[in-house]
């Protein structure tokens, strides 16, 4: 797979990382974002129905870090079987590394999850940034980037990008609907996922450039 150049990737990383920091600071400082979080969650909670709840639970499963990790590992093994070592390493490193980063950030921020008198679901783990939003952004974003770089027809690449955006938005909405995250949690998860993707592709460029230079020196 051909990688993006480091310039655009580093710009995207800077913007996404900056947005993540702004959201984290807004949460910590108790800005009006906290009121938006509470109002949005309450508005959805009182309008929840069994049918929509079941649908959102299914959507949430498709964006779960555990689900996407299993898919990524299986995909990496398939790529290795097809002798696509670079693609296998990229897929596994980006997805597993993103999950580890999210785990670290959750324990650094230690934000509690939304609280309702009659919760649909409840979890004892930390809330910010959303692991589902991050994992979906990383996994489906990686597939979209692969399509952009490798699709033979442009419309196919655009369809892949639109599908990735739709999945990330739907998974993020499901987490707020189910009462497991604030809006700012999923916003932070998406920003984290974009920043991590951009960082990985910038790093991949420099690693491959170093390997090319080493190979050229060995041949000279």
Describe the function of each predicted region.
Residues 1-67, 107-109, 113-121:
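N-terminal transmembrane-helix/juxtamembrane module of multi-pass inner/ER membrane proteins
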């Amino acid at each position: 797979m051909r990688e993006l150049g480091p310039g655009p990737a580093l710009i995207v990383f800077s913007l996404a990382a900056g947005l993540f920091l702004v959201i984290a600071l807004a949460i910590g400082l108790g800005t009006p974002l906290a009121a938006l979080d509470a109002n949005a969650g309450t508005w959805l909670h009182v309008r929840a129905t069994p049918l929509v709840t079941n649908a959102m639970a299914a959507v949430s499963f498709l964006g779960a870090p555990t689900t996407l990790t299993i898919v990524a590992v299986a995909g990496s093994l398939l790529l290795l079987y097809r002798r696509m070592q670079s693609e296998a390493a990229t897929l596994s490193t980006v997805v597993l590394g993103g999950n580890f980063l999210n785990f670290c950030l959750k324990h650094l921020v230690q934000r509690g999850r939304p609280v309702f008198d009659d919760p649909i679901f409840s979890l004892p783990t930390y809330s910010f940034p959303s692991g589902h939003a991050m994992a979906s952004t990383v996994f489906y974003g990686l597939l979209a980037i692969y399509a952009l770089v490798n699709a033979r027809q442009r419309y196919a690449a655009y369809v892949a990008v639109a599908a990735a955006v739709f999945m990330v938005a739907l998974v993020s909405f499901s987490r707020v609907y189910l009462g497991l995250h604030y809006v700012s949690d999923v916003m932070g998860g998406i920003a984290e996922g974009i920043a991590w993707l951009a960082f990985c592709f910038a790093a991949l460029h420099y690693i491959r450039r170093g390997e090319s230079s080493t190979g050229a020196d060995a041949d000279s």
